[in-house]
């Protein structure tokens, strides 16, 4: 079975790793020396590549972290 994280770039995996620490987008900016818009783009890419679509009953950030932890 293919690891869903294989679709992520190295930088997207770094962003996801900081998300897994429970950090906000602002904290990700500060840790990785990125602009807020860049972090938003990486987070969006993570959600898209992990096939996490917006849904009223789903917290995509939590689902992304769960995928990271299971890998």
Provide a role label for each language-model segment.
Residues 1-18:
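Regulatory hinge/linker segments at domain boundaries
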Residues 13-20, 47, 65:
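Hydrophobic residues on short alpha-helical segments
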Residues 20-23, 70:
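Short helix-capping/turn signature of helix-turn-helix
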Residues 56-71:
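C-terminal edge and immediately downstream basic/flexible tail or linker adjoining helix-turn-helix-like DNA-binding
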């Amino acid at each position: 079975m293919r690891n869903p994280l294989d679709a992520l770039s190295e930088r997207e995996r770094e962003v996801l790793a900081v998300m897994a620490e429970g950090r906000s987008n602002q904290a990700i900016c500060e840790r990785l020396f990125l602009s807020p818009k860049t972090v938003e783009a990486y987070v969006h890419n993570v959600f898209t590549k992990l096939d996490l679509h917006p849904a009223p009953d789903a917290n995509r950030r939590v689902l992304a972290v769960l995928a990271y932890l299971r890998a």
